[in-house]
């Protein structure tokens, strides 16, 4: 009876939501999105344009007499990012084996999965501050990168395992009786190209993330950009390290693109006798490049491990922190002030996330559409290069430049994160659009259909599952970024975490952070439940 109230039958085993319920949902979603826009976008600051122009002028008038020590900071960055990313990736592979529902029994995978969800719920701000207070800069940076890489690679690699065809794994597991051996031979070795791609994308993201790490006082070349933009803003000290950082990031992007396109990408090989020599030669070069890649990776990781100072600065600090962290202050929750009550802070954070994610989805589709193969190659490549340059510009620099233009910092943060996430997810949407059936697209073109018509009636329909996945991933990501930018006014809750930690008010810190963690855990469990339903884990793998 309840089913008939909401759905109507369109086939033997297929039901569809009744149109007026669908319309009601659309109206409700639009109302929430519009409210979030109104609540989070402030007016343009009419006096800020001159400040913005002066900041741009100062940025492009570098101080040539300042000593920057670029080589040392760049080498330090390469060491701790590579070493931390590699260490986190190794642990992610192991944990993904134990958390994949299609590989492990449900009673094993679920508890370990929940542990990783809880660990991921700790704000990056919190661990960044903890590590930077306990260890020296290089060790703190390595641990933060490792922690971040481990938790997020575990999530994505586990999803990859659960979406894979594991027939050969189960057959080998039954024959040999060893689950890990079967996993190693049928999944890890056969899919190692795809797994290395996860590492490359993680490595690239971590290099771009180094400037944000410097907020915690962690070293690296990002520190040369963050320090002049902190208390006493000095744009004239930013350009030279910025050019070096952007050049280095573009080099990393090019290396990742070449490795992912020619070394780690699975391509079908033409084994005709006439081309056999070419195929063998190609395999040989791929093997040589792969060996060189591994040698460089291990060398940088070992260099990082050797040069780290492993001393702990203040062991008692950690004990004091956790003794106070779980002593929640009930008076904060009874306040009606959204700047004090943690629950009201979460409501505000949610409206910020909704306003941002709605724009990210729109601009991701737009950017992906403009840079896909529907347009002339020269135009799409030019736009991809533009997105690349936008993506590698540090977010903190964009914030300092754009902030005078608006009356409230929260508007600036949303625009900065929109630029960052829109360009990143736009690249992903472009890849998905380019996988569409070219024959169908040509058929639309032959019938005189416009590019906009093809986007709306074919590309978006075909990529609906990808768009849903991107939206869920982006929602989780933008919430964490809003928290991270709290020290710049990005979110009340992020600002409170920063202030309470700096003042050593760890009981107040716990009162704000624990509800936030529960909120993040709830969101991830909801997304996980949707995914479990899609892979039918309860039906096929509950044993």
UniProtKB/Swiss-Prot annotation:
Which PROSITE patterns does the entry link to? ABC_TM1 (PS50928)
Keyword NAD applies: no
Task: Answer whether the UniProt record assigns the keyword NADP to this protein.
Answer: no
**Entry GO CC:** plasma membrane
> Would you say which domain of life the source belongs to?
Bacteria
Q: Which UniProt keywords apply?
A: Cell membrane, Membrane, Repeat, Transmembrane, Transmembrane helix, Transport
Q: Which residues form the ABC transmembrane type-1 domain?
A: 74-256
| SUPFAM superfamilies linked | MetI-like (SSF161098)
Here the disulfide bonds are none
Segments crossing the lipid bilayer? 18-38, 78-98, 115-135, 141-161, 211-231, 237-257, 288-308, 354-374, 379-399, 413-433, 482-502, 510-530
| GO BP annotations listed | transmembrane transport
Task: State the annotated membrane topology for this chain.
Answer: Multi-pass membrane protein
User: Where does the record say this protein resides?
Assistant: Cell membrane
* Family, as annotated: Belongs to the binding-protein-dependent transport system permease family.
What is said about the domains? Composed of two homologous domains.
State the function annotated in the UniProt record: Probably part of a high-affinity transport system.
Protein's UniProt name: ABC transport system permease protein p69
């Amino acid at each position: 009876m309840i089913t008939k109230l909401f759905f109507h039958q369109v086939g033997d085993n297929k039901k569809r939501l009744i149109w007026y319920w669908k319309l009601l949902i659309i109206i409700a979603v639009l109302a929430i999105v519009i409210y979030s826009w109104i609540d989070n976008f402030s007016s343009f600051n009419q006096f800020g344009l001159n400040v913005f122009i002066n900041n741009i002028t100062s940025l492009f008038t570098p101080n040539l007499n300042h000593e920057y020590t670029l080589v040392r900071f760049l080498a330090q960055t390469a060491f701790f990012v590579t070493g931390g990313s590699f260490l986190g990736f190794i642990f992610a592979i192991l944990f993904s084996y134990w958390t994949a529902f299609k590989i492990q029994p449900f009673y094993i995978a679920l508890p370990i999965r929940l542990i990783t969800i809880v660990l991921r719920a700790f704000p990056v701000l919190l661990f960044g501050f903890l590590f930077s207070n306990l260890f020296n800069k290089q060790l703190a940076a390595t641990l933060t990168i490792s922690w971040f890489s481990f938790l997020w690679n575990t999530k994505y690699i586990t999803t990859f395992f659960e979406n894979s065809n594991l027939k050969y794994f189960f057959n080998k597991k039954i024959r040999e009786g060893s689950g890990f051996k079967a996993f190693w031979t049928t999944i890890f070795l056969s899919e190692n190209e795809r797994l290395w791609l996860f590492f490359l994308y993680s490595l690239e993201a971590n290099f771009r993330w180094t400037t944000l790490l410097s907020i915690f006082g962690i070293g690296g070349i990002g520190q040369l950009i963050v320090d002049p933009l902190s208390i006493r803003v000095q744009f004239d000290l930013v350009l030279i390290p910025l050019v070096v950082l952007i050049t280095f990031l573009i080099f990393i992007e090019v290396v990742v693109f070449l490795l992912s396109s020619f070394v780690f990408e699975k391509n079908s090989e033409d084994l005709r006798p006439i081309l056999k020599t070419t195929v063998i030669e190609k395999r040989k070069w791929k093997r040589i490049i792969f060996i060189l890649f591994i040698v460089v990776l291990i060398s940088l990781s070992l260099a990082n491990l050797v040069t780290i100072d492993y001393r702990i600065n203040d062991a008692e600090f950690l004990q004091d922190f956790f003794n106070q962290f779980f002593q929640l202050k009930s008076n904060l929750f009874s306040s009606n002030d959204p700047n004090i009550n943690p629950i009201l802070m979460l409501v505000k954070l949610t409206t910020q996330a909704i306003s941002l994610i709605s724009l990210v989805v729109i601009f991701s589709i737009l950017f992906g559409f403009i840079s896909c193969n529907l347009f002339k190659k020269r135009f799409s490549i030019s736009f991809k290069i533009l997105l690349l340059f936008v993506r590698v510009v540090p977010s903190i620099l964009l914030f300092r430049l754009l902030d005078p233009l608006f009356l409230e910092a929260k508007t600036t943060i949303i625009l900065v994160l929109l630029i960052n996430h829109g360009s990143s997810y736009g690249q992903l949407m472009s890849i998905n659009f380019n996988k569409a059936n070219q024959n169908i697209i040509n058929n639309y073109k032959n019938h005189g259909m416009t590019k906009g018509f093809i986007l709306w009636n074919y590309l978006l329909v075909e990529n609906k599952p990808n768009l849903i996945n991107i939206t869920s991933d982006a929602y989780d990501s933008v919430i964490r970024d809003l928290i991270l930018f709290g020290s710049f006014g990005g979110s009340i809750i992020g600002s409170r975490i920063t202030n309470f930690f700096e003042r050593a008010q760890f009981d107040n810190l716990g009162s704000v952070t624990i509800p936030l963690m529960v909120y993040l855990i709830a969101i991830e469990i909801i997304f996980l439940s949707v995914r479990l339903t899609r892979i039918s884990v309860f039906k096929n793998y509950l044993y």
